Swiss-Prot record:
Name assigned to this protein: Undecaprenyl phosphate-alpha-4-amino-4-deoxy-L-arabinose arabinosyl transferase 2
Biological process terms in GO annotation: lipid A biosynthetic process; lipopolysaccharide biosynthetic process; protein O-linked glycosylation; response to iron(III) ion
Pfam families xrefs: PMT (PF02366)
Membrane association type: Multi-pass membrane protein
Residues spanning the membrane: 42-62, 113-135, 145-165, 166-186, 209-229, 241-261, 290-310, 321-341, 345-365, 380-400, 409-429, 440-460
Record-linked PANTHER family: MANNOSYLTRANSFERASE YKCB-RELATED (PTHR33908), UNDECAPRENYL PHOSPHATE-ALPHA-4-AMINO-4-DEOXY-L-ARABINOSE ARABINOSYL TRANSFERASE (PTHR33908:SF3)
E.C. numbers: 2.4.2.43
Species whose genome carries this gene: Pseudomonas fluorescens (strain ATCC BAA-477 / NRRL B-23932 / Pf-5)
Stated role: Catalyzes the transfer of the L-Ara4N moiety of the glycolipid undecaprenyl phosphate-alpha-L-Ara4N to lipid A. The modified arabinose is attached to lipid A and is required for resistance to polymyxin and cationic antimicrobial peptides.
Keywords: Cell inner membrane, Cell membrane, Glycosyltransferase, Lipid A biosynthesis, Lipid biosynthesis, Lipid metabolism, Lipopolysaccharide biosynthesis, Membrane, Transferase, Transmembrane, Transmembrane helix
Length: 583
């Protein structure tokens, strides 16, 4: 067994496995000091420009964003911060903490797009800060700290999810915090410092557990146990780990007991349906082959994908060094665990990307110090190829089968600007890789900032139904009863009107469990019942209907509704205003 490797920080650098920069390319003390002073402010400016400003530029995507917006808004409306409800119906697929943060965003900034998405953006920003801090702790090199934070902030999957309201950025933050705290605990110089870090680990595990479940406890153990065995520090894990366990229990126990008292079936459903069934059952949701995450890892790391081979080679070479070994365990073991699960979604591997960014940042700066820009140039040329191919495809499609109408030139212009920015951002490092290596980040930031706002109308009206609902909000607000045949459209309607009581027409989806309760059974009507239901509802007042019509069955659903009233159509979306019937 490898003997314990002492972890220590050197000041000033060089770091593990790093030779001094050759003559001809040096970063002097003043340059290093300047970078150390301005690294975080520069990243903060980029965060504001490319993460925060675009949050209000486009509607809510279905199904995730409308769901999380509505569930969190309903907590504010009902005052129930214990049991999650989706349009007034029990919804036990996730615990509560993720909804808390989205609800706080809406409470502070209002029931708007910024309020719904700010929790994801801030969670990602804090993860960027964690990447910076752990790299600084491991190598004490401002260049590596800046590189790791920049790479993480510009990984395609991370940047894309930062402006998307769901629970994965939050959960990723808690996992990242737990493992950064673990490293700080292991590398602490004093007992007080170690205890604080172990307590921080407990806070992260408790919040992660209340965001997405037991995985928040499993992942730190999955990394800590083999690492401590390797380092011959298992006794330390047992002694200090108890602090983290007690803090995690203290954080989560009040809600655990409260939800059990409010909804005794919550833990049965959540444990078996969301953990055991999703991981091992033959009928698991989102079933994918074991290798699903391998190509996805390459796509997720764009615009830095061509740096992956060099990163892995350098990491394997340095695997016996404590920082690199820790990061490799953090990257590989969760990736293997998620690959073994039957149910897979792209965002599940987000907790693997921070250690990848740190390893990549370290390897990148080592190559720059050694005046080795070949991999940077290859990476930029790959990105150039992608950008030029996308530009040619856009022009060809627009000329032959236009996807943008004559009144959508703004959207087309935004996409064109985004692609030109991507191309220019990669031309610079292709020409001078050692000087302009950070430039590809600008390309991906322009993409996540401009592409959603530049979507053609047929995507907006089909995938962001809240925008079509917003156009008819005043008429819908005056209706007495609401009906919808699609959960995404229904939740968008409920969120825009701040009215959870939307009756579901011939659909149940993820609300199947909640609709089985007797007090929610009346919230669904079938095709056979809809005629009578509408007739009764119109006696009480006007009825607002929002439909998504994508196939023959949904066309038949529309045909069963009574004629008359006001009718508005756009893409697959249909809004009907059925007036109150005369007595």
């Amino acid at each position: 067994m490898t003997s314990r490797i002492q972890m220590h920080r050197t000041s000033p650098p060089p770091a593990y496995g790093t030779s001094a920069p050759p003559s001809g390319f040096t970063l002097g003390a003043s340059t290093t000091s300047t970078l150390q002073r301005w690294a975080l402010p520069l990243l903060l400016v980029a965060f504001g420009l490319f993460y925060l400003l675009p949050l209000t530029s486009h509607g809510l995507w279905i199904p995730d964003e409308t769901r999380y917006a509505q569930i969190s808004q309903e907590m504010l409306l009902s005052g129930d911060w214990v049991a999650p409800h989706f349009m007034g119906i029990r919804y036990f697929e996730k615990p509560i903490a993720g909804y808390w943060l989205i609800a706080i965003g809406q409470a502070v900034f209002g029931d708007n797009l910024f309020g719904v998405r700010i929790a994801s953006a801030l969670s990602t920003g804090l993860s960027v800060l964690l990447a910076y801090l752990i790299t600084r702790r491991m190598w004490n090199d401002p260049r590596k700290s800046f590189a790791a934070a920049l790479l993480y902030m510009s990984f395609g999957l991370i940047a894309g999810q930062a402006g998307y309201s769901n629970l994965d950025p939050q959960f990723t933050l808690w996992v990242n915090l737990s493992l950064v705290a673990l490293w700080f605990a292991l590398d602490g110089r004093s007992t007080r410092e170690r205890l604080l870090a172990w307590a921080g680990l407990g806070v992260a595990c408790g919040m992660g557990f209340m965001t997405k479940g037991f995985l928040a406890w499993l992942l730190p153990v999955l990394i800590a146990l083999p690492y401590m065995i390797w380092q011959r520090r298992l006794g330390e894990l047992v002694r200090y780990g108890l602090v983290a366990v007690l803090v995690a229990i203290g954080i989560s126990l009040p809600w655990v007991l409260s939800i059990h008292a409010h909804e005794p079936d919550f833990w049965r459903f959540f444990f078996w349906h969301e953990h055991i069934r999703r991981f091992a059952a033959d009928n698991a949701q989102h079933t994918r082959p074991w290798w699903f995450y391998l190509p996805l890892l390459v796509a997720s790391s764009l615009p830095w994908a061509a740096l992956l081979p060099g990163t892995f080679m350098q990491a394997w070479k340095d695997k016996r060094q404590a920082p690199t070994g820790f990061l490799l365990l953090w990257f590989l073991l969760p990736l293997a665990f998620f690959s073994l699960s039957r149910g897979k979604l792209p965002t599940y591997i987000m907790p693997c990307l921070l250690p990848l960014a740190v390893l990549m940042g370290s390897a990148l700066i080592d190559r720059i110090n050694a005046i080795q820009g070949r991999s940077i140039r290859i990476n930029s040329l790959l990105n150039l190829l992608i950008g030029v191919a996308a530009m040619v495809a856009l022009l060809y499609i627009q000329l032959t089968r236009p996807v943008y109408g004559h009144n959508e030139m703004l959207g087309l212009s935004l996409v064109f600007i985004m692609l030109m920015g991507w191309i220019i951002a990669n031309l610079l490092p292709a020409a001078r890789p050692l000087q302009y290596w950070p430039a590809p980040a600008l390309g991906i930031w322009l993409l996540v900032a401009l592409l959603p706002a530049g979507m053609p109308g047929f995507i907006v009206h089909n995938q962001m139904p809240d925008q079509f609902i917003k156009e008819h909000i005043e008429e819908l607000r005056q209706t007495k009863t609401l009906l919808s045949n699609d959960l995404g459209a229904a939740s968008a309607l409920a969120w825009r009107l701040q009215r959870p009581e939307v009756t579901l027409y011939n659909t149940e989806g993820e609300l199947k469990y909640g609709l089985a309760y007797a007090d929610s059974a009346q919230r669904k009507v079938s095709m056979a019942e809809v005629g009578q239901w509408v007739s009764e509802a119109r006696k009480q007042g006007s009825v607002g209907v929002v439909m998504r019509v994508k196939d023959v069955v949904e066309s038949e659903e529309v045909a069963l509704l009574p004629p008359g009233g006001k009718r508005y159509e756009e893409g697959n979306m249909l809004v009907l205003i059925l007036p109150q019937s005369q007595p």
